[in-house]
Amino acid sequence: PYIHGTKVSSVSKGSLGDTVIIVPKTFEQEKIVNSLSDVDALIENLKKFIRKKKDIRQGTMQMLVTGKKRLDGFDGDWQTTTLDKLCRLVTKQTGFDYSAEIRPSLVTAPQIGTIPFIQNKDFEAFDINYNTDFFIPYDVAEKYPKILLDEVCLLISISGRIGNVAVFDNKQTAFAGGAVGIAKLFDPDLASWCMLYLSGKNGQEQIFSNEKVGAQHNLTVADVRKLEIRLPEKTEREAIIGVLADMDDEISLLVEKLHKYEKVKKGMMEELLTGKVRLM
C-alpha cells in the first residue's frame, strides 16, 4: 500500500516513517539472528563446495577430452577430423528468411501447433531451455527443414555469445534462432563427444581464433565446418563421457540440496521475523 507510481515504483519518506516494525526483546533478537546466521553459513559453505566441485569437473574435462590424461586401460591413438566430415549438414538460419516469414510468425507464449524458438541463450552443454521467449507455428517451421530441430544434433552459438556449445537432446521438436549454428551428424551418438571437445580448451581456442569482430562477435558457417575434433575409440569416448556424467550428477544433487537450504532459510525468516514461531 506504500508503493506509488506506475513506470517507476517509489516509497515516500513519510510512508517509511509510518512502517510498523515488530521488535522482540534483545535476547530473542540475538537467538533469531544466530539461527539465521547458522543457516547462512551452511548455505555459503555449500556454495563454496559446489564451486570447488565444478572447478574439479572442469579440470578433469580439460585433461580427458584433450588426451593429456588417459583413463586406465586406454592407450590407442586418437583420430583427428573436422566437424564438416562428421556432419551431413552444418547450417544456420538466414537473415532473409527471418525477416520475410519467421519473425512475423513468432509468438511469446506456447500455443497449440507451436514449437520452441531456441536462441543462443537457451542452451549450454546438455541443457536445453524449451520454455523460451518465443514460439513458432510448426506449419511455418516445417518450411525450413534444415534448421528444424527434430533430431539429436549440435548447437553452437555463432553470434554475440560465441563459443557456447550444446547437445540438442530432441526431447521435443524445436526451431533454431538466427544466432545458432546447427550441426547434424551422420552419427548422432557423436554429439556428446563433439560438444565436450569443443567446450574444452582446444575447441574454444579454435572457435575464438576464427571469430569476426564487428558490431557483434560472429562465426561463419564455414568457420564451424572446419573446426577440428579429436576422436578416441568409441569405448574410450563412452568411458570419458560416463566419468563426466557422474560428476555432473553429483553437482546436480548438491545444487538441489542448496535450493532446499535456501527455501528453509526463507521459511525460517517468514516464521521467526513475524513472530509466528518463537525460539525458546
How should each PLM-predicted stretch be described?
Residues P1, S10-L16, F117-K121, N131-S199:
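A short beta-sheet element
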Residues I3-F27, A109-I112, I158, T173-G181, ...:
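A short glycine-rich beta-alpha junction/loop motif
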Residues D18, T26, L71-I102, K226, ...:
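Non-catalytic DNA-recognition/assembly elements of restriction-modification systems
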Residues V23-D77, E228-M280:
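Amphipathic alpha-helical coiled-coil/heptad-repeat segments
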Residues D84-T108, K121-E151:
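Sequence-specific dsDNA recognition surfaces
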